[in-house]
């Protein structure tokens, strides 16, 4: 039997959240072990778009965290050992109907009241910023603070940055159990050995309920599939990251998505690819792309 490995903190899951936690704890000189049953960014963090989009957040803790997160990206771009392709492109929420305009007027007002740099602009102003926009839109909300990042590179940067600071990174390692002593975590059992630690952080994403169940915790997370179309490289056509007002409505009111549609998000990466998204489907852990899902995105 292998001798147990001792560490201060075990982080389960090397997606963007787990890798970020490991990196920042390692900067505080803690002994950190990062466990991942697949590879770095092999789950949701490697299958998402790259929007750093403040306008889609409701005032409150989500917008507060998003604003603080955005302030850190320039520093992270300099600190991390991997180019993360962060760009502050500005962002727009495109408004296509009077109902959307009314809703966005209130939404923008609430965001402005908590300090977000965002404003409503009319059709002509929006099309001046983005000439590719349809002449049939009513306008948009605009923030110069929105941007994009490469989520895979960012996750790899956190994980490899943590490793360079002394953290241990194990990929292809599955967690089998979590031991407790007197009501406290004492060790994590894996198929590669036992890791003794006083702190275990569950950053397993959609698999967090499986980890929670090992210590009797019911974690209310369900997987949701979001399909995205990725195009071939194109010449620069889009200056801003954009989403539709329908996207925000569907995000906060999933039950109305069947009526109004899921909306659309669109961005052009630094390399020229367009990312067009996305669907919102509760289909368990089915990761397959579907003709119907891609058709719905393309039809938007």
Label for each model-derived stretch:
Residues 49-129, 263:
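Dinucleotide-binding Rossmann-like beta1-alpha1 core, especially the glycine-rich loop
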